């Protein structure tokens, strides 16, 4: 392996451009070796000012570019399966943004392909596991100081939804973060989901079922509820409260400034997930680069990506039917160990 890990970045949109900046100026030990995006001009703009970066419009060309030793996938979800399989065929370690693959059948194909390799190559970008507040909550729950977790209360609010955002995407794009966070925090698989749909907000685009209230059941008997509101109009908020047998703990309130002035006080609200979770993204990519340079894969696994896809699909069915839906996972390959919820 070279002195600097050569990374091919697939996708040069909002997320891809942010990762290109991160690899170039924030994370040590890596460099952007190649970028692929169907819109070549967008890729060229994302790497402007960087030396030695090869720009391509095809995934295969970027993966085969000189100096490429690892892959960061930040393209739209439907392109992920092909890119992951191409990386596997070349033996390249991958950090893949969520969703790993949008549908559970495709996600299972990734799990099975990696299992046939007999070694992990893929890490999925569930960045909340790298957020300082979430890491502190995980450590506290694992310590047992508050007793057994009984419930998680989660809040997920966005300023507004982008064009083309559908009611199903509230579950499989937004709540997918809470799906993985709940599995990781509790160390339990989610076994059933119910979705309640209040009257849509006046701020929601016509036809969008926003907000929604999602209730998950877990294998260990805990409950997880999620309020998802993607057209709040005021900011990006993510909160989580764990209610345990001997106490409770809440995160998500303390990451912005509290301003006091004449007549009162107010707290600023982040406007974008890249602002709220900037440090988490930095930590995630830094740890991935360091582990890859050691020949290891340590973060959320392809199994985690598959499980999130299965739960999200059950959530969309519950949203459509109004019924409680159970979650059925395929048998877990031995590659992912006795404790399937990694990191």
Swiss-Prot record:
Q: Which GO terms describe its biological process?
A: inositol catabolic process
Q: Note the SUPFAM superfamilies from the entry.
A: Glyceraldehyde-3-phosphate dehydrogenase-like, C-terminal domain, NAD(P)-binding Rossmann-fold domains
What Gene3D superfamilies has UniProt attached to this entry?
Dihydrodipicolinate Reductase, domain 2 (3.30.360.10), NAD(P)-binding Rossmann-like Domain (3.40.50.720)
> What reaction gets catalysed by this protein?
myo-inositol + NAD(+) = scyllo-inosose + NADH + H(+)
Q: Which UniProt keywords apply?
A: NAD, Oxidoreductase
| One annotated GO molecular function | nucleotide binding
The enzyme's E.C. designation: 1.1.1.18
Q: Which InterPro entries match?
A: Gfo-Idh-MocA_inositol_DH, Gfo/Idh/MocA-like_OxRdtase_C, Gfo/Idh/MocA-like_OxRdtase_N, MI/DCI_dehydrogenase, NAD(P)-bd_dom_sf
Pfam family of the protein (one) = GFO_IDH_MocA_C
PANTHER family from the entry? INOSITOL 2-DEHYDROGENASE, PTHR43593
Q: What function does the entry list?
A: Involved in the oxidation of myo-inositol (MI) to 2-keto-myo-inositol (2KMI or 2-inosose).
Q: Which HAMAP family match?
A: IolG
Q: Which family does it belong to?
A: Belongs to the Gfo/Idh/MocA family.
Q: How does it assemble?
A: Homotetramer.
Return the protein name. Inositol 2-dehydrogenase
Write down the species.
Streptomyces avermitilis (strain ATCC 31267 / DSM 46492 / JCM 5070 / NBRC 14893 / NCIMB 12804 / NRRL 8165 / MA-4680)
Q: What is the lineage of its organism?
A: Bacteria, Bacillati, Actinomycetota, Actinomycetes, Kitasatosporales
Q: Which gene encodes it?
A: iolG
């Amino acid at each position: 392996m070279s002195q600097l890990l050569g990374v091919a970045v697939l996708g040069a949109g909002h997320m891809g451009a942010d990762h290109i900046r991160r690899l170039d100026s924030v994370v040590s030990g890596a460099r952007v070796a190649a970028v692929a995006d169907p819109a070549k001009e967008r890729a060229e703009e994302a790497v402007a000012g960087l030396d030695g970066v090869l720009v391509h419009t095809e995934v295969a060309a970027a993966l085969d570019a000189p100096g490429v030793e690892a892959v960061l996938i930040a393209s739209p979800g439907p392109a992920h399966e092909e890119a992951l399989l191409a990386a596997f065929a070349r033996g390249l370690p991958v950090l893949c943004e969520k969703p790993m693959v949008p549908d559970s059948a495709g996600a299972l194909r990734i799990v099975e392909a990696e299992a046939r390799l007999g070694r992990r190559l893929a890490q999925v970008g569930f960045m909340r596991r790298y957020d300082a507040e979430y890491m502190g909550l995980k450590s506290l729950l694992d310590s047992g100081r508050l007793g057994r977790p009984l419930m998680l209360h989660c809040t997920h609010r966005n300023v507004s939804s982008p064009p083309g955002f559908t009611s199903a995407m509230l579950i499989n794009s937004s709540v997918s973060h809470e799906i993985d966070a709940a599995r990781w925090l509790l160390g339990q698989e989610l076994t059933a989901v119910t979705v309640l749909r209040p009257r849509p907000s006046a701020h929601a685009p016509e036809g969008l079922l926003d907000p929604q209230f999602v209730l998950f059941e877990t294998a260990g008997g805990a409950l997880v509820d999620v309020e998802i509101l993607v057209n709040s109009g005021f900011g990006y908020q993510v909160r989580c409260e764990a209610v345990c047998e001997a106490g409770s703990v809440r995160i998500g309130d303390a990451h912005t400034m509290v301003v006091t002035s004449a007549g009162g006080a107010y707290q600023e609200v982040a406007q974008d997930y890249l602002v709220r979770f900037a440090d988490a993204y930095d930590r995630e990519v830094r740890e991935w680069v360091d582990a890859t340079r050691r020949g290891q894969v340590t973060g959320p696994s392809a199994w985690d990506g598959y499980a999130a896809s299965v739960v999200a699909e059950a959530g969309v069915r519950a949203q459509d039917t109004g019924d409680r839906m159970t979650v059925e996972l395929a048998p877990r390959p031995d590659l992912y160990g006795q404790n399937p919820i990694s990191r």
